[in-house]
Amino acid sequence: MKQLCCSCLLWLGLLLTPFSREEEEESRPRKLCGRHLLIEVIKLCGQSDWSRFEMEEQSPMTQFFPHYSRKGKAFNPHPSSSAWRRFTNPVPAGVSQKKGTHTWEPQSLPDYQFEKTELLPKARVFSYHSGKPYVKSVQLQKKSTNKMNTFRSLFWGNHSQRKRRGFADKCCVIGCTKEEMAVACLPFVDF
């Protein structure tokens, strides 16, 4: 009976040994340079299966061009009520085709106002009548750089020398763990 328990524990220990080595590999820094570092970061950041998400509503092309779709339809730059017509048909419809090939008469802009819903969500339009448009644009830039500074301080800590040394240099010279390489994915995460 004792031998059976001991042999079971021995086999259990032998089976768990490879799994304990995997945890050591994740916490151990690895020196990666150049394309090897890039491949590891891409593997780490792109582990989730993006094909199961419906990306059409979030695509920037569908915000600007409602006729564009990723579901196999081709993009049609010539819809009937579009500003594209101004550049693709420079001659008014009443002019003959022969005369149209020898003259270039640009049409006027169509009378249509852009709605705020068609603009990018973070885009802001400032006029000079509002007082200080430069100050407002600087404030918007500060918000985006504050996020980057937060990411940087998570990775580098408060050491100025470490901040000066780049991410690739640190991983190449000293080495990076998987947790440190995961910080490279943070700028691509939408908060």
From Swiss-Prot:
GO BP of this protein: apoptotic process; ectopic germ cell programmed cell death; fertilization; flagellated sperm motility; male gonad development; negative regulation of apoptotic process; negative regulation of developmental process; negative regulation of reproductive process
Residues cleaved off as propeptide: 53-161
Primary subcellular site in the record, as a coarse category: secreted
GO cellular component, one term: extracellular region
Key word ATP-binding present: no
Name of one Pfam family that matches: Insulin
RNA-binding found in the keyword field: no
InterPro entries: Insulin-like, Insulin-like_pep_6, Insulin-like_sf, Insulin_CS, Repro_Hormone_Insulin-like
Keywords noted in UniProt: Cleavage on pair of basic residues, Disulfide bond, Hormone, Secreted, Signal
GO molecular function per UniProt: hormone activity
Coiled coil: none
Disulfide bond annotation, renumbered to this chain: 33-172, 45-185, 171-176
Leader peptide range in chain numbering: 1-22
Location of this chain's protein in the cell: Secreted
Source organism superkingdom: Eukaryota
Homology family: Belongs to the insulin family.
Function: May have a role in sperm development and fertilization.
Protein name: Insulin-like peptide INSL6
Species whose genome carries this gene: Mus musculus
